[in-house]
Structures are given as structure tokens and as C-alpha cells.
Regions:
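Catalytic cores of DNA base-excision repair glycosylases
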Residues: 2-209
Length: 209
């Protein structure tokens, strides 16, 4: 049974309250580095990405440098990451598109971001919200799992349905805090196996809601 909007909001706000200082866990210094890091994080832990990116960004600090590199040169720096050959191909193509279509700058709109090779809706939403402060809600595996486990959405909900549901429940200024808190919550408490959510009864203290 999917929770009412008021009860779902209560659960999400309690998760935010558990991790009020949650921050992005990917290391980056500018919009290009953020875009690259998020692209690399697909099916890979943020910790693994953070080990690979310092040398990658030193070798290819700009879209121009990345576009000029061969795929094999890029692969050398990310070979310990999942799907690294595909990611190297996407990074080179994406860098070329940034130069050709956006004067070497990372665009700010979802439509423009999703026009880039290797950039889907989740990556676009992270870049918009974290990089540019534009309200957007990114759905990763933690977010989707938590929303289903806590009946915020039905078990069959797609990532887009999860995104729209959370955006309907929370005001825009809470979308990014919710996304980041849910990642922490998913890692520390709401595990894929043996979740420990029952130790946090405040999540379910609905009172008269």
C-alpha cells in the first residue's frame, strides 16, 4: 500500500533530519569534473571513482584535453571502473560535443545535458542540482530502493515515476537535500539486504497523519 502524500513527506523529512549535513560524495572542482565524475559513477561506487579521477583530471583537465586524447589513453586512467571501455568512449565523445555545441562549457538545461553522449536523466539531474543549484531530483539505486522499501512508491515504479512522486511530495528546495540524505541513509541504514530501518521508529510515527 503506497503511503499518502502526508505520510510519505514525513518519511522523507525524517530521512533528511537523520543526515542534515549530507554532501555529494564525488570529488570535483568545476562543472566539467562533476559531469565526468557522475558519468563514471554508473555501476561503480563513488569511492572507486574518487580514486580514479585525480590522475584522470590531471591528464585531461579540460574538454579540449579530453577530446584530443585517444580512447585508450582515457581507458588507462579508469580501467579499474566498471564498463570502463564504454565510459572512455562516452567521455571522449562528450568532450567533443561540449566543444562543438557549447563552446567548451557544461550546459545547464536537462535537454542540453541529455544531448551529450553517455548522459542520461539521472546524470543530468545531478549536474543541474549539485553543479548549478537548479532544482532537480536524481534517482539512483539507493533512492529507488528506499522509496520502494518505505512504500513511497509502488514496487513496480520506474525511476521516472519515483522522481515525479518525490518532486510532488517535497518542495523544490528539499529535492537536493533529500537526494543526498537518501544516499547516506541507503549506505548506512536501508541496506539492500538486512535493512535496519526498524531501529528508527520516528520514520513511522505518523500520529494523526
Amino acid at each position: 500500500m503506497v503511503l499518502s502524500k502526508k505520510r510519505a513527506r514525513k518519511v522523507l523529512e525524517e530521512i533528511i533530519a537523520l543526515f542534515p549535513d549530507a554532501k555529494p560524495s564525488l570529488d570535483f572542482r568545476d562543472h566539467f569534473e562533476l559531469l565526468v565524475a557522475v558519468m563514471l559513477s554508473a555501476q561503480t561506487t563513488d569511492a572507486a571513482v574518487n580514486k580514479a579521477t585525480p590522475a584522470l583530471f590531471e591528464a585531461f583537465p579540460t574538454p579540449q584535453a579530453m577530446a584530443d586524447a585517444s580512447e585508450s589513453e582515457i581507458e588507462k586512467h579508469i580501467s579499474r571502473l566498471g564498463l570502463y571501455r564504454n565510459k572512455a568512449k562516452f567521455l571522449k565523445k562528450c568532450a567533443q560535443q561540449l566543444l562543438e555545441d557549447f563552446d567548451g562549457q557544461v550546459p545547464q538545461t536537462r535537454e542540453e545535458l541529455e544531448s551529450l553522449a553517455g548522459v542520461g536523466r539521472k546524470t543530468a539531474n545531478v549536474v543541474m542540482s549539485v553543479g548549478f543549484g537548479i532544482p532537480a531530483f536524481a534517482v539512483d539505486t539507493h533512492v529507488e530502493r528506499i522509496c520502494k522499501h518505505h512504500d513511497i512508491v509502488k514496487e513496480s515504479a520506474t525511476p521516472l515515476e519515483v522522481e515525479k512522486r518525490v518532486m510532488d511530495i517535497l518542495p523544490p528546495e528539499k529535492w537536493l537535500p533529500a537526494h543526498q540524505a537518501m544516499i547516506y541513509f541507503g549506505r548506512a541504514i536501508c541496506h539492500p539486504k538486512n535493512p535496519e530501518c526498524e531501529h528508527y521508529p520516528q520514520l513511522y510515527d505518523f500520529g494523526s497523519l
